A protein has these predicted regions:
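Glycine-rich, proline-tolerant flexible connector loops at the mouths of alpha/beta enzymes
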Residues: 50-68, 232-241, 301-312
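N-terminal amphipathic alpha-helix/helix-capping segment at the start of soluble metabolic enzymes
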Residues: 1-22, 76, 255, 265
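Domain-level signature for soluble enzymes in the chorismate/prephenate branch of the shikimate pathway
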Residues: 262-360
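Catalytic domains of carbohydrate-active enzymes, especially glycoside hydrolases
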Residues: 36-53, 101
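Hydrophobic faces of well-ordered beta-strands that scaffold small-molecule active sites
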Residues: 19-25, 47-51, 85-87, 106-108, ...
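Active-site mouth loops of central-metabolism enzymes
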Residues: 19-36, 60-65, 84-89, 109-110, ...
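Catalytic alpha/beta core domains of metabolic enzymes, predominantly
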Residues: 14, 118-249, 256, 261-269
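Catalytic beta/alpha-barrel core
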Residues: 66, 82-91, 95, 104-119, ...
Length: 360
């Protein structure tokens, strides 16, 4: 699969003057609830109305969706508001029912993207259709798995594709329900710059008070749109109550978001930008040289350990380095999260170099 301008055609054809907005409840609960939310969203920036019909819950016994009857409610949404409709599908049966009920957009959830078998089943059942299909990132932070899901759909001749960044599950402590791991989405964007990229701040945040800042950051990173869970009575929602906003709150969020220019033609701006970028390039080159020298020293330590039959990993020394770097990093305006990621990667590379020496 190669990047192509055609990837963005379905989005361009919507002819929007603002980022794409997909909104609606985490779960379709009743016909009245679904229609009320949709009508409240009719005169907003929302283009696609989403609702969970089948809910893949972590544990049995939790609300797992109303099922196929909810698709009839979405037909009424389209009839009353003109909004496009979207649901999550997790198997060929879901796809068949969604198509039969005229659903416009299908998305593959994070729990499904992790399974090549599920994605392939969905891809096979979509062959010959013209639906828009959006692929959420897998639960675990694995770009290859995310790309694999997209490629399976593309190979099934499904060309109206996009991706949804909803964050990743990790064991690390975080204020977010799912860590954004922005660099993974950015890497995907760099490989396929014309593949529509949508942020789901609701699932990243897990809390409605974090949604605005996440949405702004996504737009600052040139995302094409947002998927925000919206409910008429979020505190009493049957699922994910804490991360849903009211339609009026959604309007406020969209009103306050700033849409940045991709670039401008001012000569002074371009000259200053070129100067700053040159400084970054120089700094990056110095970083690589320093890291190379550090690995040279790590290899010498590896030789010393080998000659004295000493184990590679020295936890006490590693913890001392990490503690010192966190303190030093903060004095340079670097977050603890960033320092941990950088030095864990450096430490792992050092271990790899020393392990190669011990095994040689």
């Amino acid at each position: 699969m190669k990047n192509s301008k055609q990837m963005k055609k379905w989005l361009d054809d919507l002819n929007l003057s603002h980022p794409l907005v997909i909104a609606g409840p985490c779960s379709a609960e009743t016909e009245q609830q679904v229609l009320k939310i949709a009508i409240d969203l009719k005169e907003t920036d929302v283009t696609i109305f989403r609702a969970g019909i089948w809910k893949p819950r972590t544990r049995p016994g939790m609300f797992e969706g109303v099922g196929a009857i909810g698709l009839k409610w979405l037909q009424k949404v389209k009839e009353h508001t003109g909004l496009l409709t979207a649901v999550e599908v997790a198997n060929s049966s879901h796809v068949k029912l969604a198509i039969e009920h005229g659903i416009d957009v299908l998305w593959i959830g994070a729990r499904s993207t992790v399974s090549p078998f599920i994605v392939q089943e969905i891809a096979d059942s979509l062959q010959g259709t013209d639906k828009i299909v959006l692929v959420k990132n897998p639960v675990n932070p694995d770009l290859s798995l995310w790309l694999g899901g997209i490629e399976r759909l593309y190979s099934a001749n499904i060309k109206k594709l996009g991706v949804i960044h909803r964050g990743f599950s990790t064991y690390e402590k975080s204020k977010y329900r799912n860590n954004p791991e922005w660099q993974i989405a950015i890497e995907l964007q760099s490989k396929f710059p014309d593949l529509p990229l949508i942020c789901d701040p609701s699932h990243i945040a897990g809390r409605r008070d974090l949604i605005f800042n996440l949405s702004q950051r996504a737009l600052d990173l040139n995302y094409d749109g947002l998927m925000i869970e919206t409910h008429c009575d979020p505190d009493n929602a049957w699922s994910d109550a804490a991360q849903q906003v009211t339609p009026s709150s959604l309007v406020d969020i969209m009103k306050d978001l700033k849409i940045r220019e991709m670039t401008i033609d001012k000569e002074e701006y371009k000259n200053q930008l070129d100067g700053f970028r040159q400084k970054i390039d120089n700094s990056d080159q110095l970083l690589l040289e320093i890291l190379g020298k550090r690995m040279d020293v790590a290899e010498k330590i590896g030789l010393l350990k080998k000659s004295n039959n000493v184990a590679v990993l020295q936890n006490k020394r590693w913890n001392e380095i990490l503690g010192k770097m966190i303190i030093d990093g903060e004095s340079h305006g670097l977050s603890e999260e960033f320092i941990l990621k950088i030095f864990k990667a450096i430490h792992q590379e050092s271990i790899n170099h020393q392990q190669n020496i011990l095994n040689s």
